Amino acid sequence: TLNKIRYSPMQGAHLSLIYRYYAHDYWAMFAHSFGESSSVQNENGWCLSGEITPSRYWKLFASIDLFSFPWWKYRISKPSQGVDGLLQVTFAPHENLTMYLNYRYKRKERDVSGTNGKITLPVYHHRLRYRLNYSPGELFSFRTTADYNHFHSLGKLPGQGYQLTQVITCRPLHFPLKTELQGSYFYTDDYDTRVYIAEKGLLYTFYTPSFQGEGVRVAINLRYDLNTHWMVIAKFGQTIYMNRSEIGSGYDLIASNKKADLQMQLRLKF
């Protein structure tokens, strides 16, 4: 069950309270809903959020989510609970220039390695993101994103990770070709501090791969609308790692520090 209450005490401000209850023995293969987990199962929680627009240029948003898992799940072999908080400030001085800065804090529980699930300890994850969107004209638009992660738990050295991504989009006015070029640099200490970098994929698809270690990622996405019926999309991306000489293992082993991917799509609409 999912229940929501929304209240607006004044113009430009509102509060929302969401309660969710997903039984641990509930199964829905393709269901998606609001929650900490990706599946609609084994989760209870309360989420309180609020947004206020003090002026035409500024917007403040804050939320806190208190959740619990009544049954065991990945990396935790007993009932557990946690908290997820978010604070975001958005500044839009002009219609073609917007930016925001947000801070996210998350605390969860995890089994201690080597104890067979008998001992659990809290883990803490701090995330900081800055994003700038700028469109100087109708031809080009730019998006800059900087992320920083900090992860720590009791009895373990803290780790950190960060990434910087620049996206350049070109939309010619009198030519039906849209080009998006994206470049990223990432560095993380370990798997827990991995970074996620969203990329524009094919039509009706989402692509947000995770990266760990040190390296760069470049991708180019081309969309050409031949006419009102035909459309072609092609995407090429390559990841280059600076801290390893091979990628993967077993049958997926790549004896190089480079990994490339190519995607294409043809659509006929009638």
Residue ranges with predicted function:
Residues 1-270:
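Exposed, low-structure sequence patches enriched in small/polar residues
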